[in-house]
């Protein structure tokens, strides 16, 4: 059992890879094309001073279900919605493991479960677009599981040394960032959001990088923003193939 975490804020596949970046899987998303534009009725995360985080995330998750089920319909893979769990406060254990310290949200791989704490700095200190992005990122891990990317990544990581295993993990997380951008780009026109909102979200994403931390799990802020923007701009999951990217792009 693995937990794929989102921590709180404090290229094409047709060429040979450098040895340090060896691809664990031929990207099955490359042939799926552009995600269709869709409407996602974004509710207020706070209404009349009352936090409505659960209602907000429930609505967004339904949008993610709809968009990804439609997009993956032609991949010959069975689409299954993830289970969604909400917690008003951290529990001693979740998905059979200890609650991960400092996690904003996470995906339980074997149980295909999205876990959202409903309190904390990730909710309180950010634009409501950041919870939207976090939900889309964790859903990206669900897509990686559905398409077989996760299984092949874990197989490659199990055979790798410490440094390469960490790099593979960042490639995996940055791909989820990019997939979140694909979804955001596909629904952006329905959100009534402007350029300033997008820039604020990019700034929050840059600030969520692990540039200064000992734990190098999700990538530098600049790289997180790069992959988010790449997915948002192209709206093509195939553009999120982080596995052949140069090491500097996944640092």
Set out the residue ranges of the language-model regions.
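A metal-dependent hydrolase signature that marks the N-terminal structural subdomain at the beginning
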Residues: 3-95, 232-246
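Pan-zinc metallopeptidase signature
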Residues: 30, 206-251
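Second-shell loop/turn segments in exported
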Residues: 46-57, 119-130, 161-170, 191, ...
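Active-site recognition of the HExxH zinc-binding catalytic motif
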Residues: 68, 133-146, 177
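Active-site scaffold of zinc-dependent metalloenzymes
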Residues: 96-129, 145
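Post-HEXXH active-site segment of zinc metalloproteases
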Residues: 145-173
């Amino acid at each position: 059992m693995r937990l794929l975490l989102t921590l709180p804020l404090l290229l094409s596949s047709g060429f040979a890879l450098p040895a340090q970046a060896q691809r664990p899987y031929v990207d099955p998303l490359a042939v799926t094309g552009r995600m269709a534009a869709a409407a996602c009725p974004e509710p207020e995360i706070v209404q009349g001073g009352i936090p409505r985080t659960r209602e907000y995330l429930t609505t967004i998750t339904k949008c993610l279900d709809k968009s990804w089920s439609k997009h993956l319909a032609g991949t010959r893979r069975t689409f299954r919605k993830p289970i969604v769990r909400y917690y008003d406060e951290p529990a001693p254990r979740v998905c059979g493991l200890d609650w991960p310290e400092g996690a904003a949200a996470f995906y339980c791989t074997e149980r295909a479960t999205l876990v959202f704490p409903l309190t904390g700095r990730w909710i309180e200190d950010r634009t409501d677009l950041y919870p939207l992005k976090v939900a889309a990122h964790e859903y990206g891990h669900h897509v990686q599981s559905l398409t077989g990317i996760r299984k092949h990544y874990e197989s490659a990581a199990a055979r790798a040394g410490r440094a390469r295993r960490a790099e593979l993990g960042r490639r995996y997380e940055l791909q989820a960032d990019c997939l979140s951008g694909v979804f955001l780009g596909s629904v952006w026109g329905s959100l009534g959001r402007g350029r300033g909102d997008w820039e604020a979200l990019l700034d929050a994403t840059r600030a969520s990088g692990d540039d200064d931390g000992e734990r190098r799990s999700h990538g530098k802020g600049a790289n997180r923003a790069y992959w988010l923007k790449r997915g948002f701009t192209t709206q093509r999951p195939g553009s999120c193939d982080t596995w052949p990217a140069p090491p500097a792009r996944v640092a």
